[in-house]
Amino acid sequence: AGTYPPVVXATLXRTH
């Protein structure tokens, strides 16, 4: 989300 690509958001959501 934001300046980060979709993969980062997906990873963060998964690890969070």
UniProtKB/Swiss-Prot annotation:
PTM per Swiss-Prot/TrEMBL: Glycosylated.
For this UniProt record, the keywords arranged alphabetically read as follows: Glycoprotein, Glycosidase, Hydrolase
EC number(s) recorded for this UniProt protein: 3.2.1.118
Report TM segments.
none
- Top-level EC class: hydrolase
What reaction does this catalyse? (R)-prunasin + H2O = mandelonitrile + D-glucose
Disulfide-bonded cysteines: none
For this UniProt entry, the molecular function terms from Gene Ontology, in alphabetical order, are: prunasin beta-glucosidase activity
Q: The organism sits in which domain of life? A: Eukaryota
Assembly notes: Homodimer.
- What name is this protein filed under? Prunasin beta-glucosidase 2A
What is the source species? Prunus serotina
Query: What lineage, starting at the top, does this entry show?
Result: Eukaryota, Viridiplantae, Streptophyta, Embryophyta, Tracheophyta
